[in-house]
C-alpha cells in the first residue's frame, strides 16, 4: 500500500512539474534601456525576448515569467554649479583711503559636486577723491602719540623698550635707563593669547591685543619648568603656570550621526556679544561650555568619511593645560597692525572694506583661556556593525575609553570592561574594539603637527604606536594652542581712536551682513533630511543616521521614513525704520517645507530690533568719537546777539530745517513723524525778543503701530503700521489657540479690544478633549459623548461665523461651542467662515455657498467645514479649497442652465462647475434647474 502511495506521489509531482515548470531564462532579457534621467534618480527598463511557441503555451510561461523589469538609475543628485553675480558699479572714491571698490556676490553656492567659484568677489582701484576726509587726527591729549596712532604715557618715551610697536617712541633719544633691574624672558607662546578668533571659520587669525606691550611695568611670573621668571604683558590680568593631566577627565560622546553634533547649542548667545543683536549664532567655549566642534577643519573630513558608509561616531577628548590666563577687561593695547587697520577704515559704510577686518583678524578675541593641548579623536564606526555587536551606546563609549586608556595613555586607573573584548565586533579584530572602527579623525589641538597627525589612524593600518601620546604630550609644552577659552567680540575693542563710535556702528552692520554669508539657507535641500552646511562657496550635506552617499542619497535597509523635515529659507532684508524706531525682517520654513509628517522649523520666523533714521538731509556719516555726545544736528553754534534758539516742539514732532539759531522773522513748519498728523497751526515765527510766536499744535496718531506680542504668536497681515479701520489676526501653531480674542482692529490711536502683554497660546480645548473621539466629542470612560457647550467650552477658542438653519440667522460662536452644538444637533448648524461674522463679500459668499450646498451630492468633513462638489479639502490647512472650473468632472449631476458674465445665451453646467465659477467671484445667473432649453 505504501509503495502505491509513493508511486502516485511521484507521478503527481511529474505532472505538476510538466505543467508549471517554465524555464523563463529560455527567453533572454534585452539590454537595459538608457536611463530616463542623467541625475536625480531616473529609471531604466528591459524586456524578455518572448517567442510564443508550443513550449511557451504548454508550460504557462505567460503566467509564470516576468516580461519586464525596471530599476532606479543615476540616483545621484544633479550637480549645482557655483554662480557669481555681476560686479556692481564702482563705489564713490573714499577720501580717507583714496580707493574705490566694486563687489559681486555668490548667487548660488556649488553643491552635489558642482563646479566651485574661484574668482574674487571684490576688486579695488586707486582714485582721486572729490571730498575731504572727515576723520580727525588722534588726540592723545597729555600722552605721547606714536606713528602707528597708539597713545602711550609720556613716561614710556625713551625708556629703551618698544612701547609704540613701531619704535617711534625711541627715536632721537640719548642715554636710556632700563625699566627693570634684570632681564626677563617673555612668556612662551604669549602671542597666541592675543590672536583674533574667527568664530564662523573656527580658527585663529591675526594679532588683536598686543601682548608684547609691557607698559613700563616689571610684573613677573615663575614657571616650574624654567629657572628664570617671565615678564607679564600689560594686557594680562592674571597668568599662572600648571601642567595638568588628570586621569578621570577623559570624556567620550556617542553620536548617531554628525547631524546631531552641537545642534542648536547656546543659541541665546549673539555673534556680536549684544543680547538684543539681530543675528544669533551659538558661541562655543572649547570644552567648558559646549562640545561643538562643527567649525573645526577636521569636521569637514568627518563629513566626507560619513558619505562612504552609514556611520555612527564616538568622540574621545581630553584637555591638557600648561598655563591659564585672563585678559584685562579695559584699556587693552591693540596690536600695531590691527590698530592701523581700524584707523584706515573709511567713515562711510562700505561692506567690502569693513568685512576685511573679520577676514584678517577674526570676529572675536580671547578674554580668558588656557595654553596647552587637546587630545581629540572622532572614531567612525559602521552603524550596522555596532548594531550587530550587541553593545549599547553607553557600553560603546566605555569601550572606546577603556581601550584608549589601556593602549595609548597608560593610565593606572583603568577598569576592565569584559564586554569590550568579547563582543562580536572586537572578536573580529583580536579583541580590539578600536580596530573595528573605520578610521579615527584627528581634531587634536596643540603639539607638533607630526605627533598630532600620528594620533589618528585608518582601517587596515597598524595603528598608532604605543608611545605616540606621550610624544605628543611632550611636544604640547613647546607648541601649545589656546584651549578652554572664552570669547568677546573684537568690535568691543574699537575705542579711543578717531570716529570710534561711527566705526563701531559700521562694524556691527558689516558683521550682520558678513555672518549671513555663512548661513546654509543658501543651499538646496539635501536628500533624506540631510543637513546642509556651507563651507566657503560650497554646500556639503551632513547625513542623518541611516543614510549615506556623497549627497546622503543612499539609504540603509532599515531606513524607511519618507518624511521631509522643514528647513529655514534666508532672512528677508530689514524693513525701513518705523515711527517706533523699530525694524523687522522675516523668513519662511520653505527650504524645504515640511512634508509627509516632517518636523517644522525650530526658531523664530521674524525678528525685530531697535533702529534710527535721519530726518535731515543726508550729508555723509558724522565722525563720532567715544568722548563726544554728538548727534546729526550738533553743528557749531554761531556767535550772535539776535535770533531764536530751537523752538520747543510738541511730542512726536520735528522741523525740516532744524538748526541751532534762527534769524528774526524766520518761520519753521512743524511736521509730525510717520503715523501722526498735525492738528492746529503748524507755523512758528521768530520774534525780535528771541522768543517764538506759536499757536496750539499737536501731533495726533493716525495709525496703529504693529503690536509687540510673544514670539509664539503670528500676526497677519504683517506690517509696520496699520491705518485706522484695519484689522489683524493672531494665530498659533497647529494644536494651539490664542488665549483670548484673535482679531483686533485699529481705532484711533490704539487697538480694540486692547491687546494684553500676557497674551499667548494655549493647548486647543478641542485637542485636549478629543482623545480618540471626533470633533465636538469628548471621551467619557471608554465611550465618546458630545461635549457640553456650557460646561466644556469655558476656555477660549477661536471665533467662527455660523449659520443656524432653524432660525435662518447667522451669528458668531466659539469653535468649541459650534462643534458641541453640531454634535448635539447635527444638521442645524453650518460653518460660514473663520472669524467673527462681519458684513462683506466673505459673508455673502458663505451664505450663498450654503444655498448651493443643498444641491451638492458630495459632503466631506474638513476641519470645522464640510467640502462640497466644487471643493477639495487641503490636508495642510484643513480648509476647503475651490476647484478651478476645468478641474470639475464632466458628469451630469445636478445640471443648471446659467448665464455667465455678459453672455446673453444660457449654458448648461453641473453643480461643480457652477460652484467653482461662483467661488472664483465671477457673475453667474441661474436661469433654471436642468438643461437649457433651446
Curated annotation (Swiss-Prot):
Recorded GO CC terms: extracellular space; membrane attack complex
Range of residues in the leader sequence: 1-21
Pfam families registered for this protein in UniProt: EGF_C8A_B_C6, Kazal_C6, Ldl_recept_a, MACPF, Sushi, TSP_1
Region (C5B-binding domain): 642-934
Cystine pairs: 22-61, 24-65, 35-73, 39-78, 82-117, 93-127, 96-133, 140-151, 146-164, 158-173, 180-218, 399-420, 499-623, 521-570, 523-539, 526-541, 543-552, 577-611, 589-601, 644-686, 672-699, 704-746, 732-761, 773-823, 784-801, 786-837, 793-816, 862-873, 867-919, 880-897, 882-932, 888-912
Entry membrane topology: Multi-pass membrane protein
Function description: Component of the membrane attack complex (MAC), a multiprotein complex activated by the complement cascade, which inserts into a target cell membrane and forms a pore, leading to target cell membrane rupture and cell lysis. The MAC is initiated by proteolytic cleavage of C5 into complement C5b in response to the classical, alternative, lectin and GZMK complement pathways. The complement pathways consist in a cascade of proteins that leads to phagocytosis and breakdown of pathogens and signaling that strengthens the adaptive immune system.
Protein name, UniProt field: Complement component C6
Organism annotation: Rattus norvegicus (Rat)
Amino acid at each position: 500500500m505504501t509503495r502505491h502511495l509513493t508511486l502516485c506521489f511521484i507521478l503527481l509531482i511529474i505532472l505538476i512539474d510538466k505543467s508549471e515548470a517554465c524555464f523563463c531564462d529560455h527567453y533572454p532579457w534585452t539590454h537595459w534601456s538608457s536611463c530616463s534621467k542623467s541625475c536625480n534618480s531616473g529609471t531604466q527598463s528591459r524586456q524578455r525576448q518572448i517567442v510564443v511557441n508550443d513550449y511557451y503555451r504548454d508550460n504557462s510561461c505567460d503566467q509564470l515569467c516576468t516580461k519586464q523589469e525596471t530599476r532606479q538609475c543615476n540616483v545621484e543628485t544633479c550637480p549645482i554649479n557655483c554662480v557669481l553675480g555681476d560686479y556692481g558699479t564702482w563705489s564713490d572714491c573714499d577720501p580717507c583711503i583714496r580707493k574705490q571698490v566694486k563687489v559681486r556676490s555668490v548667487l548660488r553656492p556649488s553643491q552635489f559636486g558642482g563646479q566651485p567659484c574661484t574668482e574674487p568677489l571684490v576688486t579695488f582701484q586707486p582714485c582721486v577723491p572729490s571730498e575731504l576726509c572727515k576723520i580727525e587726527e588722534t588726540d592723545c591729549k597729555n600722552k605721547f602719540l606714536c606713528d602707528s596712532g597708539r597713545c602711550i604715557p609720556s613716561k614710556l618715551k625713551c625708556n629703551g623698550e618698544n612701547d609704540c610697536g613701531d619704535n617711534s617712541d625711541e627715536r632721537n633719544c640719548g642715554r636710556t635707563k632700563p625699566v627693570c633691574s634684570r632681564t626677563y624672558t617673555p612668556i612662551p607662546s604669549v602671542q597666541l593669547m592675543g590672536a583674533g578668533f574667527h568664530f564662523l571659520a573656527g580658527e585663529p587669525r591675526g594679532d588683536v591685543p598686543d601682548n608684547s606691550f609691557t607698559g613700563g611695568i616689571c610684573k613677573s611670573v615663575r614657571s616650574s619648568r624654567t629657572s628664570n621668571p617671565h615678564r607679564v604683558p600689560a594686557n594680562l590680568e592674571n597668568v599662572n603656570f600648571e601642567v595638568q593631566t588628570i586621569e578621570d577627565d577623559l570624556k567620550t560622546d556617542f553620536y548617531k550621526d554628525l547631524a546631531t553634533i552641537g545642534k542648536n547649542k547656546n543659541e541665546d548667545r549673539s555673534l556680536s556679544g549684544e543680547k538684543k543683536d539681530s543675528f544669533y549664532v551659538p558661541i562655543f567655549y572649547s570644552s567648558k561650555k559646549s562640545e561643538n566642534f562643527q567649525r573645526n577643519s577636521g569636521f569637514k573630513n568627518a563629513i566626507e568619511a560619513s558619505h562612504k558608509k552609514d556611520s555612527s561616531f564616538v568622540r574621545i577628548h581630553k584637555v591638557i593645560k600648561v598655563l591659564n590666563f585672563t585678559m584685562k577687561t579695559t584699556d587693552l593695547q591693540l596690536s600695531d597692525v590691527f590698530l592701523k587697520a581700524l584707523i584706515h577704515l573709511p567713515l562711510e559704510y562700505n561692506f567690502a572694506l569693513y568685512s576685511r577686518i573679520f577676514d584678517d583678524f577674526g570676529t572675536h578675541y580671547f578674554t580668558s583661556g588656557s595654553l596647552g593641548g587637546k587630545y581629540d579623536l572622532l572614531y567612525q564606526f559602521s552603524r550596522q556593525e555596532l548594531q550587530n555587536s550587541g553593545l549599547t551606546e553607553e557600553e560603546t563609549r566605555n569601550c572606546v575609553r577603556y581601550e584608549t586608556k589601556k593602549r595609548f595613555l597608560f593610565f593606572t586607573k583603568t577598569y576592565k570592561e569584559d564586554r569590550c573584548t568579547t563582543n562580536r565586533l572586537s572578536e573580529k579584530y583580536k579583541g580590539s574594539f578600536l580596530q573595528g572602527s573605520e578610521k579615527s579623525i584627528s581634531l587634536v589641538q596643540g603639539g607638533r603637527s607630526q605627533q598630532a597627525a600620528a594620533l589618528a589612524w585608518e582601517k587596515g593600518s597598524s595603528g598608532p604606536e604605543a608611545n605616540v601620546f606621550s610624544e605628543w604630550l611632550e611636544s604640547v609644552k613647546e607648541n601649545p594652542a589656546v584651549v578652554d577659552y572664552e570669547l568677546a567680540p573684537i568690535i568691543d575693542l574699537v575705542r579711543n581712536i578717531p570716529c570710534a563710535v561711527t566705526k563701531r556702528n559700521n562694524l556691527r552692520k558689516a558683521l550682520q551682513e558678513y555672518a549671513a554669508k555663512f548661513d546654509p539657507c543658501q543651499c538646496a535641500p539635501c536628500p533624506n533630511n540631510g543637513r546642509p552646511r556651507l563651507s566657503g562657496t560650497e554646500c556639503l550635506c551632513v547625513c542623518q543616521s541611516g543614510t549615506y552617499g556623497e549627497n546622503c542619497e543612499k539609504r540603509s535597509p532599515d531606513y524607511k521614513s519618507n518624511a521631509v523635515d522643514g528647513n529655514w529659507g534666508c532672512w528677508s532684508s530689514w524693513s525701513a525704520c518705523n515711527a517706533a524706531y523699530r525694524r523687522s525682517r522675516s523668513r519662511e520654513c520653505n527650504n524645504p517645507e515640511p512634508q509627509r509628517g516632517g518636523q517644522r522649523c525650530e526658531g523664530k520666523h521674524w525678528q525685530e530690533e531697535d533702529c534710527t533714521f535721519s530726518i535731515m538731509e543726508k550729508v555723509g556719516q558724522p565722525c563720532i568719537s567715544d568722548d563726544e555726545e554728538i548727534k546729526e544736528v550738533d553743528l557749531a553754534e554761531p556767535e550772535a546777539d539776535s535770533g531764536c534758539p530751537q523752538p520747543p516742539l510738541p511730542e512726536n514732532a520735528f522741523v525740516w530745517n532744524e538748526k541751532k539759531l534762527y534769524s528774526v522773522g524766520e518761520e519753521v513748519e512743524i511736521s509730525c513723524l510717520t503715523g501722526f498728523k498735525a492738528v492746529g497751526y503748524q507755523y512758528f515765527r521768530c520774534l525780535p525778543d528771541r522768543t517764538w510766536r506759536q499757536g496750539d499744535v499737536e501731533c495726533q496718531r493716525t495709525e496703529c503701530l504693529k503690536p509687540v506680542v510673544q514670539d509664539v504668536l503670528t500676526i497677519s497681515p504683517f506690517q509696520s503700521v496699520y491705518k485706522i479701520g484695519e484689522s489683524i489676526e493672531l494665530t498659533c501653531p497647529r494644536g494651539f489657540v490664542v488665549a483670548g480674542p484673535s482679531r483686533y482692529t485699529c481705532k484711533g490711536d490704539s487697538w480694540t479690544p486692547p491687546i494684553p502683554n500676557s497674551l499667548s497660546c494655549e493647548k486647543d480645548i478641542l485637542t485636549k478633549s478629543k482623545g480618540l473621539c471626533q470633533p465636538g466629542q469628548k471621551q467619557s470612560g471608554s465611550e465618546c459623548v458630545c461635549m457640553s457647550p456650557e460646561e466644556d467650552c469655558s476656555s477660549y477658542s477661536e471665533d467662527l461665523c455660523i449659520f443656524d438653519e432653524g432660525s435662518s440667522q447667522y451669528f458668531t460662536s466659539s469653535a468649541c461651542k459650534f462643534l458641541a452644538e453640531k454634535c448635539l444637533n447635527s444638521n442645524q448648524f453650518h460653518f460660514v467662515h473663520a472669524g467673527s461674522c462681519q458684513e462683506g463679500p466673505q459673508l455673502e459668499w458663505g451664505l450663498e455657498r450654503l444655498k448651493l450646498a443643498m444641491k451638492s451630492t458630495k459632503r466631506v468633513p474638513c476641519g470645522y467645514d464640510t467640502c462640497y462638489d466644487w471643493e477639495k479639502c487641503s490636508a495642510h490647512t484643513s480648509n476647503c479649497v475651490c476647484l478651478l472650473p476645468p478641474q470639475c468632472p464632466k458628469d451630469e449631476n445636478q445640471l443648471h442652465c446659467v448665464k455667465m458674465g455678459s453672455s446673453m445665451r444660457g449654458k448648461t453646467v453641473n453643480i461643480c462647475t457652477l460652484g467653482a465659477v461662483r467661488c472664483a467671484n465671477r457673475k453667474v445667473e441661474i436661469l433654471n434647474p436642468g438643461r437649457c432649453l433651446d
